[in-house]
Amino acid sequence: MNGIEAVGNHPDIIAGSNNGDGYDYKPECRYFEVNVHGQFGGIVYYQEIQPLTFDCHAMYLPEIRGFSKEIGLAFWRYILTNTTVQCVTSFAARKFRHGQMYCAMIGLKRVGTIKKYFKGVDDVTFYSATREELIDFLNHGR
């Protein structure tokens, strides 16, 4: 199992996603390792799902979740500086409240909920922001 799968399959991360199915490495994604004060704490990643549209996600171990906002904002700065992304999306299962709060905390706007999105069981709330909305959020906050 590679490091990405090790994080994605950590019991505390599985508990909040995909009905406990775990995570498989996807070669089409661009992954970034997260370290806080020298300690490995998780992964952030994106996948270009449409031209210039990135589906973005984070998998943090519990001990670094207190830094999640700073990590998320640094990730936005990185992709805005190093790519031409025009839209970002993300989603969080209804049962994973931390994921929903995280999306709002880093400047994404709630788009809506799709019922039974994960395996016909879990409802999932989707979030998005344009490049301009992210830049404005980074410059001014809410």
Enumerate the predicted regions with their spans:
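Short beta-strand micro-motifs in enzyme catalytic cores
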Residues: 30-32, 54, 121-127
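Short, high-confidence coil segments that cap the C-terminus of an alpha-helix
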Residues: 29, 84-85
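Short amphipathic alpha-helix that is part of the acyltransferase structural core
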Residues: 1-21
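Conserved acetyl-CoA binding element of GNAT-fold acetyltransferases
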Residues: 49-63, 91
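Conserved beta-strand in the GNAT
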Residues: 33, 38-48, 55
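Conserved beta-strand-loop-alpha-helix junction that forms the acyl-donor binding cleft
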Residues: 89-101, 117-118
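Conserved acetyl-CoA-binding loop-helix of GNAT-fold acetyltransferases
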Residues: 65-81, 101, 105
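Conserved catalytic-core motifs of GNAT/GCN5-like acyltransferases
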Residues: 91, 109-125
